[in-house]
Swiss-Prot record:
Belongs to the CoA-transferase III family. This is (R)-2-hydroxy-4-methylpentanoate CoA-transferase. It comes from Clostridioides difficile (Peptoclostridium difficile). GO terms for molecular function: transferase activity. Gene3D superfamilies: Crotonobetainyl-coa:carnitine coa-transferase, domain 1 (3.40.50.10540), formyl-coa transferase, domain 3 (3.30.1540.10). Pfam families: CoA_transf_3.
């Protein structure tokens, strides 16, 4: 595998940092996940999302933690920190989302250990960045990414309340960015032997994702947009005859208008100077949306899909998460896969969104139980059985 021989130590919880470490594990790195004695907090969150959350079936934990070894260590104890240091001494990459103040209390913040481990890549998820008035504020996907980052406001219908957003969306993009940054630093290490501090914040990830809208806002482009008054009538959503919705994305208005008008049988639009070029259209958007909307109600989504595909015009049907579970395109490309849990039930999980043609997909190793590999890992660090048992008795470790 691509990252065979790379060692990753993960001290994190929930989604953003764990999914980064999982990607590295998916690509062949050895990942050791450190959980507290009680386990990662996401292990008990399934019920909030109507999902199983038992030791025998826990898809929310599984999604972020497959292809890892799991150890359970009390890193607030002196002995636990000692074990952590031994792990870091052998690691190429350290992935964490623990806040800087907490890392400082343990003596493992970047500035405290960079000289001790000069080749270590210290990769950290932050809420709001390293500086500024919010640098110490806890950041979550819902807050730092969606709310403060402007994403919630961008997906609401104008004049309505902010959207109740999809959990984990921003976390996964932040994790993907951290994985990319970590690998760039790993390349530098291969050349120089020197480590690096890599940070990705949820807030910055949102700002980057919203970059087009943020940069155009200074020139008068406003968000949120109403679907009835978008930037272009050919770049919005429409309801079809069967009640399903379609997204048009005809971003080159002048180029595609003629072909589209023929598809919807409204060629008279091309003779109307209010609509037949982009310069005049921008002053009559709502009127043209009504015309197109009436046309789209004449056929079902499947009927429009066939006609638009034949015309080679960009569009897509709007799907739900339930639809995606059965999406033939997703299954054909191995974007999804099935896992049988210890409970005997089979569920669908999502693969990391990067494919390597020659390497293929690594054979999946299920996410660990709490402390499943504690003994194995401690022995590899030189601890004998008696010492490990003493650690367990004093609640330094769990297995």
């Amino acid at each position: 595998m691509l990252l065979e021989g790379v060692k990753v130590v993960e001290l994190s919880s929930f989604i953003a940092a764990p999914c980064c470490a999982k990607m590295l594990g998916d690509w062949g790195a050895e990942v050791i996940k450190i959980e507290p004695i009680e386990g990662d907090g996401i292990r008990v969150m399934g019920g909030t999302f109507k999902s199983p959350a038992s030791d025998d079936e826990n898809p929310m934990f599984e999604l972020e933690n497959g292809n890892k070894k799991g150890v359970s260590i009390n890193v607030k104890s002196k002995e636990g920190v000692e074990i952590l240091h031994k792990l870091l001494s052998e690691a190429d990459i350290f992935v964490t989302n623990v806040r800087v103040q907490a890392l400082e209390k343990m003596g493992i913040a970047y500035d405290q250990i960079k000289d001790k481990y000069p080749g270590l890549i210290f990769s950290q998820i932050l809420g709001y960045g390293e500086k500024g008035p919010l640098k110490d504020k806890p950041g979550f996907d819902y807050t730092a990414y969606f709310a403060r980052g402007g994403v919630s406001q961008s997906v609401m219908e104008k004049g309505t309340s902010p959207a109740n957003t999809a959990a984990g969306f921003g976390d996964h993009y932040a994790g993907l960015a951290l994985a990319a940054g970590s690998l760039a630093a790993l390349h530098k290490k291969a050349q120089t032997g020197k480590g690096e501090r890599v940070t990705v914040s949820l807030f910055h990830t949102a700002i980057y994702g919203m970059g087009t809208m943020i940069t155009t806002a200074q020139y008068g482009n406003e968000m949120p947009l109403s679907r009835e008054n978008p930037n272009s009538p050919l770049m919005t959503t429409y309801k079809c005859k069967d009640g399903r919705w379609i997204q048009l994305a005809l971003i080159q208005y002048n180029k595609w208008l003629g072909k589209f008008c023929k598809v919807i049988n409204r060629e008279y639009i091309l003779e109307d100077d209010r609509y037949n070029n982009i310069d005049s259209m921008v002053n009559h958007v709502e009127d043209l949306v009504k015309i197109v909307g009436e046309a789209m109600l004449e056929k079902t989504l499947d009927e429009w899909s066939a006609l638009l595909e034949e015309a080679d015009l960009p569009f897509e049907k709007i799907q739900s998460c339930e639809d995606l579970l059965d999406d033939e395109q997703a299954w054909a490309n191995d974007f999804l896969f099935k896992k049988t849990y210890d409970s005997g039930n089979t569920g669908v999980l999502v693969n990391t969104p990067v494919m390597f043609r020659n390497e293929g997909i690594k054979e999946y190793t299920p996410a660990p139980k709490v402390g499943q590999h504690t003994v194995e890992v401690l022995k590899s660090l030189g601890y004998d059985e008696e010492k490990i048992n003493n650690f367990k008795d004093s609640k330094v470790v769990r297995y």
